């Protein structure tokens, strides 16, 4: 089962804990995106599917959306290694990686974000510091956590060589 918890960082609809660097024109300076599903529903679905031993895959780009999945998994009564997967995990923080490791949540990074939207993330979406942390594969490796990387076709072409290059080099188009 795939739950979609938020939107995209490049569209400024990912659900964040800190405001966007430059919010959309129609939003205030405190705009942080928004969840697509309330926490209560996320927790209910994770618990129900865990009881049925059905793995959960959750689209979570923003760190606030990641918090929602972490909370739901923590509160669920997971009797087995459930292999919950967090799709995209673009802005997960260090403390979230620690919790994900503890709860065995596997991140699957959309790591070509650095190539396709890195400049936009730096200059408009997150600012320099947060943009440098997009898809934190090094932090994940340092924790000896399993993770995967993926393209999100048709959002970007299904080019595995560019995906691996982007994951290791983290260079923008410019």
Describe every region a protein language model picked out:
Residues 1-63, 99-106, 111-112, 164-166:
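Metal-coordinating catalytic core of metallo-dependent amide/deamination hydrolases
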Residues 31-33, 82-84, 122-125:
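Short, contiguous strand/loop micro-motifs
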Residues 36, 87, 127-128:
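Residue-level marker of alpha-helix boundaries and capping positions
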Residues 48-57, 77-83, 143-147:
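Short, surface-exposed connector motifs at secondary-structure boundaries
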Residues 57-61, 85-90:
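Catalytic beta/alpha-barrel core
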Residues 66-77:
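Distinct, well-ordered alpha-helical segments
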Residues 76-85, 92-96:
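Long amphipathic alpha-helical scaffold regions
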Residues 91-174:
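Active-site-adjacent C-terminal substructures of enzyme catalytic domains
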């Amino acid at each position: 089962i795939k739950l979609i918890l938020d939107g995209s960082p490049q569209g400024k609809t990912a659900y964040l804990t800190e405001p966007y660097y430059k919010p959309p024109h129609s939003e205030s300076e405190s705009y942080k995106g928004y969840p697509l599903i309330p926490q209560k529903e996320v927790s209910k679905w994770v618990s129900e599917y865990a009881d049925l031993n059905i793995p959960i895959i959750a689209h979570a780009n923003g760190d606030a959306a990641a918090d929602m999945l972490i909370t739901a998994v923590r509160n669920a009564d997971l009797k087995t290694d459930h292999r919950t997967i967090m799709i995209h995990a673009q802005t997960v923080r260090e403390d979230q990686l620690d919790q994900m490791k503890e709860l065995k949540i596997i991140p699957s990074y959309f790591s070509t974000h650095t190539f396709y939207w890195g400049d936009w993330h730096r200059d408009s979406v997150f600012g320099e510091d947060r943009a440098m942390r997009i898809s934190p594969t090094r932090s994940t490796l340092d924790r000896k956590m399993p993770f995967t990387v993926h393209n999100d076709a048709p959002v970007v072409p299904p080019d595995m060589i560019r995906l691996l290059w982007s994951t290791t080099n983290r260079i923008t188009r410019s």
